């Protein structure tokens, strides 16, 4: 089982992936908020043998920016947990201006 956390941004998202044992497999993969960006994320995941059957994704509902990545992944049958920003407010304060830290926090939350 794999656990992916995505920190959502207007133009760029940052992803962090943990293995079942909690070991980071990647911590700061940036990808653009485009179809090509989503495809680059899938390429990275497939290289590690992560697939819809063995991957859980968590992402924060940031404005409307999360909708495109959610739709992209949902259309490919990935299991996605949308996290309320109120729940993650403490992490934003712990990692101000640090999407890498927030992506890791979201990954640990869905694990």
What does each model-identified segment do?
Residues 1-111:
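Phosphate- and other anionic-substrate recognition elements at nucleic-acid/protein interfaces
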């Amino acid at each position: 089982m794999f656990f992916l956390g995505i920190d959502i941004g207007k133009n760029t998202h940052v992803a962090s992936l943990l293995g079942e044992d909690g070991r980071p497999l990647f911590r700061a993969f940036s990808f653009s908020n485009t179809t090509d960006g989503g495809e680059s994320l899938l390429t990275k995941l497939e290289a590690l043998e992560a697939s819809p059957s063995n991957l859980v994704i968590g992402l924060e509902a940031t404005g409307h920016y999360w909708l495109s990545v959610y739709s992209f992944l949902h259309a490919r049958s990935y299991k996605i947990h949308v996290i309320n920003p109120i729940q993650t407010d403490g992490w934003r304060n712990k990692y101000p201006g640090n999407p890498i830290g927030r992506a890791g926090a979201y990954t640990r939350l869905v694990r």
